[in-house]
């Protein structure tokens, strides 16, 4: 157990600092922007320092563990800890949130509330990934929903209230099942109710009850990830949200569902996961084909990118269902990879809209001539999204492929069928990705408009995009940079999984 409360500071700092925004002098928005960015940078530096100097990569056990009494009546403790499974998402959260704050620089209306909500969401997301208590996990899970709802409903597009309401109905509805599962697992004990992850890991349940718990948790994570058919809120939400909010949604929020699926369903409910893993593979394969087939029919640029996110989440679902070291590591790698790529694509879509004020692809064209820097960056991240070799998407999807092929749980024909479906999805991805680039950047529609003049990407925007592009290429060239964080923890999960 850590003697210094690193994780408590990391979790509490953003929302505490955000609460102080109201005390800043009213001298325009610049002070609020710089204050928020400095807090995000400080938080990221603290996280990096704590992990570099106080975390052992070869130790699969929980590290930097903290356990403080909170509510004795319910045996509810403030329990935090980090292992190889949660370290990557925590660092991703800090990185993407810092860049999203910088991306929100043009936001001037109610700037104080906007930046407070971003910092509050930061705390909720870090808390979710580092919680070691089921009730604390649920509280952090809910904490980040409120800021996102307000960011959508106050700073969104024309249909922002509809999309925000749809978002909260899906996610809050899923949270009801999450709360029921948390309550059921906590109360199922012969002695005292417990919500401690370590205790629950060694808890056994009747198969029927474990299946009920598994389904409840799965519905909550399926609504958040999203997994079909609970995905319909995502295109509407991305279509209306400000692009800085889209960066947080695509980069972090969607990954929380996949994280919960591994952390709780796979680690705490192994027998039920073994039963449902073939269905996860089937759902993931259908999701890849469905989203990749639906995406080309979307006229709205951000909705097309949103459907590509749904398709990529299918690879994560398949990797989790493969029940192999390789497949699960591939899913974790895809979580990190798509966090970068999705955030960058939505940032590019938003900055493009700021310039041309068009959202429909069939109205665009010829932007490459007018904005070559943006064209270069959009093309680079489109290549990363369609899994170009040398970029992170290719490595992640390839590792998931290997995980399915080497899985001892499935017969040869089901593995061939799933692999074939995934291959079709990988063929469809370049179709909608490259056609999207063609519709935006090629042709002469905007170039022939009288008095057409558009400003190319500025230094701030290029800085954000380069900061995201570097890890995408870095992971593509040296994937061990991410895999080294999780490989020992994945082995520990699966070794205990098969021997229980």
Swiss-Prot record:
Main localisation: plastid
Catalytic activity: a plastoquinone + NADH + (n+1) H(+)(in) = a plastoquinol + NAD(+) + n H(+)(out); a plastoquinone + NADPH + (n+1) H(+)(in) = a plastoquinol + NADP(+) + n H(+)(out)
Enzyme class: translocase
Topology class, membrane: Multi-pass membrane protein
GO CC terms in record: chloroplast thylakoid membrane
Cystine crosslinks: none
Any coiled-coil regions, as ranges: none
Keywords: Chloroplast, Membrane, NAD, NADP, Plastid, Plastoquinone, Quinone, Thylakoid, Translocase, Transmembrane, Transmembrane helix
Catalytic activity, EC: 7.1.1.-
UniProt cross-references to InterPro entries, sorted A to Z: NADH_Q_OxRdtase_chain4, NADH_Q_OxRdtase_chainM/4, NADH_UbQ_OxRdtase, ND/Mrp_TM
Localization in the cell: Plastid, Chloroplast thylakoid membrane
Annotated TM spans: 4-24, 37-57, 87-107, 113-130, 134-154, 167-187, 208-228, 242-262, 272-292, 305-325, 330-350, 386-406, 416-436, 462-482
Gene Ontology MF term list: NADH dehydrogenase (ubiquinone) activity; ubiquinone binding
A biological process term (GO) from this entry: ATP synthesis coupled electron transport
Matching NCBIfam families: NDH_I_M
Family of this protein: Belongs to the complex I subunit 4 family.
Protein name as annotated: NAD(P)H-quinone oxidoreductase chain 4, chloroplastic
Upper lineage: Eukaryota, Viridiplantae, Streptophyta, Embryophyta, Tracheophyta
């Amino acid at each position: 157990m850590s003697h210094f409360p690193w994780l408590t500071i990391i979790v509490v700092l953003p929302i505490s600092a955000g609460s102080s925004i109201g005390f800043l002098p009213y001298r325009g928005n610049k002070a609020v922007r710089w204050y928020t960015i400095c807090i995000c940078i400080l938080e990221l530096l603290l996280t990096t320092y704590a992990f570099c100097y106080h975390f052992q990569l070869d130790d699969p056990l929980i590290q930097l563990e903290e356990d403080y009494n909170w509510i004795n009546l319910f045996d509810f403790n403030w329990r935090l800890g980090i292992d190889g499974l949660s370290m990557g998402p925590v660092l991703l959260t800090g990185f993407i949130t810092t860049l999203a704050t910088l991306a929100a620089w043009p936001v001037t209306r109610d700037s104080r509330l906007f930046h407070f909500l971003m910092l509050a969401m930061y705390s909720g997301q870090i808390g979710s990934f580092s919680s070691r208590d089921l009730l604390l996990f649920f509280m952090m899970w809910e904490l980040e929903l409120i800021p996102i709802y307000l960011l959508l409903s106050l700073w969104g597009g024309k249909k922002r209230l509809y999309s925000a309401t749809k978002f909260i109905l899906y996610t809050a509805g899923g949270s009801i099942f999450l709360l029921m599962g948390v309550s059921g697992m906590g109360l199922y004990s012969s002695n005292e109710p417990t919500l401690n992850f370590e205790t629950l890991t060694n808890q056994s349940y009747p198969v029927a009850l474990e299946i009920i718990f598994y389904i409840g948790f799965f519905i909550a994570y399926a609504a958040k990830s999203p997994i079909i058919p609970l995905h319909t809120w995502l295109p509407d939400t991305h279509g209306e949200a400000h692009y800085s909010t889209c960066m947080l949604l695509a980069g972090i929020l969607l990954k929380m569902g996949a994280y919960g699926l591994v952390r709780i369903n796979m680690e705490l409910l192994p027998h039920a996961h073994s039963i449902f893993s073939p269905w996860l593979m089937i759902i993931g394969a259908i999701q890849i084909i469905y989203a990749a087939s639906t995406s080309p029919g979307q006229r709205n640029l951000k909705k097309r990118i949103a459907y590509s996110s749904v398709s990529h989440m299918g690879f994560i679902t398949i990797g989790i269902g493969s029940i192999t070291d390789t497949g699960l590591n591939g899913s974790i790698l895809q979580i990190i990879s798509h966090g970068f790529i999705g955030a960058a694509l939505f940032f590019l879509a938003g900055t493009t809209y700021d310039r041309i004020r068009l959202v429909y692809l069939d109205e665009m064209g010829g932007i490459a001539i007018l904005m070559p820097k943006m064209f270069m960056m959009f093309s680079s991240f489109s290549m990363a999204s369609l899994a170009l070799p040398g970029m992170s998407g290719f490595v992640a999807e390839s590792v998931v492929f290997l995980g399915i092929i080497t899985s001892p749980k499935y017969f040869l024909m089901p593995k061939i069928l799933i692999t074939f479906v995934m291959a079709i999805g990988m063929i469809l991805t370049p179709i909608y990705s490259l056609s999207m680039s063609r519709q935006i950047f090629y042709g002469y529609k905007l170039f022939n408009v009288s008095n057409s003049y558009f400003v190319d990407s500025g230094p701030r925007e290029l800085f954000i995009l380069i900061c995201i592009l570097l890890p995408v290429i870095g992971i593509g060239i040296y994937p061990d940079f991410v895999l080294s964080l999780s490989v020992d923890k994945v082995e520990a999960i699966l070794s205990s999984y098969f021997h229980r």
